[in-house]
Amino acid sequence: MSKFYKVLLASVLLMPSVVYAAEEGKETEREAASLTANIKRIAVQYNQNSVTNKEEDAEYPGTYTSDEQSVFTGIFDGNLEYNNATLVWLNSLFMEYGHSETQQNGEKTKSENADKILLTTDYTHKIWKLEEGIVGPFVNLGYQTEFTKFKADDGKKYRTKIVRGKAGMKLYEGKYFKELYAAAVEEADYTYGAANMKTAGEIGYQFEYQIRDDMKFVSDGFFRKYFIYDKYRNTDFKFEAETNNRLDVAIVGGLSFAPFVNYKVAKTRGAKKRRSDTTVGLSLGYQTDYKFF
């Protein structure tokens, strides 16, 4: 295990004691503390995707090889949030899946347009309270996998298995930018068996703008650039970027209707050209929260 992961794992394991220490002896902060279960989004969306340079390079994994068809996709995005005057601790789960099936000459072909499971725990320490939001260091540890296996260029099937650690600085709880961060990233990729260690840099954001009472623009995204690899694998990304944008229109309660446009682009080590995937569609979603205290 690299020094980065030892430090990151120690930070994550110490989170409960840090939370307790922050609470101990601070009655006013304890009263202001909250524990909330956030269902950020449960949605079913109908979408059409378009992949560029699909026929020119084979060295791309997963949904970058999907067919250009209309499909239904299911999404779940939720977290458990502990928040007080000095820290924010999030434990999150994100899942999405969508696929299409076609039959030609008696042969059925399946194409995945979305397949992702992401578990993360994230600790942010609040240091500076600015007009634009709260700024402080953060650590994040996550595990990314998928529901079904994909077929690689060697003819075998594999399932994405990535442990990803991040450490950096974050702007949190801003008026528009709910999250804006820059971080160093260390990955342990177990997709093809033995760990393939990778080092990268990443910037990302979450943005919200309330257009009117019943309408809100929501956007999130990231850019990740890899610098160091432990092994060579032609499907390893050199860089990866993604932005997801939707216009939430409230219907009733937590139910909303949203047109959306998502775009992701990447280039692998074995490809000559970068490949992009654009998805447009409509979604029906639900969001709510429950405060324990």
State each model region's role.
Residues 41-52, 84, 95-101, 141-149, ...:
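Transmembrane beta-strands of outer-membrane beta-barrel pores
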Residues 47-73, 103-109:
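Surface-exposed strand-loop-strand hairpins of Gram-negative outer-membrane beta-barrel proteins
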Residues 33-44, 89-93, 119, 133-141, ...:
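Transmembrane beta-strands of outer-membrane beta-barrel proteins
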Residues 24-36, 81-90, 126-136, 172-180, ...:
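Short loop/turn motifs that connect adjacent beta-strands in outer-membrane beta-barrel proteins
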Residues 74-82, 119-125, 143, 165-173, ...:
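Residues on the lipid-exposed face of transmembrane beta-strands in outer-membrane beta-barrel proteins
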Residues 236-293:
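Predominantly the C-terminal beta-signal and adjacent terminal strand-loop region
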